[in-house]
Every structure is written in C-alpha cells, then in structure tokens.
Amino acid sequence: MTGQTPLLEAKNLQCERDDRILFENLSFSVHSGDVVQIEGPNGAGKTTLLKLLCGLAPLRQGELFWRGERMSQARPQFLSSLLYLGHKTGVKALLTPLENLRAWCAQREDVNEERMMSALETVGLAGYEYSPCNSLSAGQQRRAALARLHVSSAPLWVLDEAFTAIDKKGVAQLETLLREKANGGGAVILTTHHSLHLSGEVRRIQLGAVS
C-alpha cells in the first residue's frame, strides 16, 4: 500500500464514556481492497468507533481524512461514497422489503426495479417482496437490509454486526459478497461476533486495551 492514498484515515481518535477511556491515540488507514474487522469485548467501543468514522457521533479528539482530505472539507464526497448498515436494520416496519429497498435506492443509487427484485431474491426473500416487514422474522428483516449491499456502488461499506440473525447460507453469501467488494477495489469495515471465513487477508483492529 506504500504510496497509495488511503480511502479513509483516522488519526489519534479517542472515545470516553462515563469517565472511562474506551480507546485513545487510535490511528489506522483503510485502503482500496481492505477488509477491516474491529474487535474487542462488549463495551470496548466498537459500535461507537464505527459511528465516529461515519459522522454519526461527535468526534471530540483526533482527525479523519477521506481520500487524503480532511473530513471537514470532504464530508459530501464521503457521505456519497458510504454505505453504513447499523446494528439496527433501519428497515421500516410498515413497508415491504421492495418498498424499503426502493426508498433507500431513491436517495443513493440509480437502480431499476428488476435489479432490486434480483437483490431480494439473492438474499432469500423471493415470495416476500410485497409482505410488510412487520410480518417477517428478525432474520428476514435483516436480509431486507442486506439487500442494499447487492445494489450498492459505494466504495466504502461500514457494517455493524451484519451477520446477526442470518442462517448459514446467508452467512456464506455475505462473506463472499464482502470479499468481492474488496477484490473490486472497495473496502469494508465491520464488527461481528461471527468467526469470518473470508478468502484473502482480513485486517484486525483490537479495542479494549486501554484501562
């Protein structure tokens, strides 16, 4: 990676909660082709770190850079290049999986109906495209959210516990998709309690070492 400008760079990040430092002086970079797993025990700040990176939590110490520019200047470009999938699915309960995906794409992606239907079929929701999400299981609702990955052209994916509530087939499918994203020049940052079985390298950042 020598000489290559990182997609995302973090310098000297710190997170404090209830007068306890979760992490400090945290610096790392994420390049095209990277899959980066954030590790640490519960309460170590993994979700908070993802939110800091995505601008969903206030950054009180440290700096972020997107493609070599300070995040304060590059925010619009960064947001248009980001897909964030949080621990909560963000799926609207009264909408169907197709309506949810259609609404999401309307704000971010130029995707036709055929491709949306294909994405829902790929994640195992064939036959449920028109069912309200509040009638679906937790795993099916998670799959409705994961369908976004199959239509996303964003170069950076940030995923918080994306493997939650999906079956073995869905896990294998998602692992393949993440590797394909990286191999295609994108990058993935994720947290998961699942043991990843991805071909190629997975970089790991360990939290929880600060007392």
From Swiss-Prot:
Annotated compartments: Cell inner membrane
Disulfide bonds: none
Keywords recorded for this protein, A-Z: ATP-binding, Cell inner membrane, Cell membrane, Cytochrome c-type biogenesis, Membrane, Nucleotide-binding, Translocase, Transport
The protein's enzyme class: translocase
Gene Ontology BP term (one): cytochrome complex assembly
Coiled-coil ranges from the UniProt annotation: none
SMART domains: AAA
The keyword Cell cycle is annotated on this UniProt entry: no
A single GO molecular function term of this UniProt record: ABC-type heme transporter activity
Classification via Gene3D superfamilies: P-loop containing nucleotide triphosphate hydrolases
Family stated for the protein in its record: Belongs to the ABC transporter superfamily. CcmA exporter (TC 3.A.1.107) family.
UniProt-recorded name of the protein: Cytochrome c biogenesis ATP-binding export protein CcmA
The organism's taxonomic lineage, starting at the top: Bacteria, Pseudomonadati, Pseudomonadota, Gammaproteobacteria, Oceanospirillales
Name of the gene: ccmA
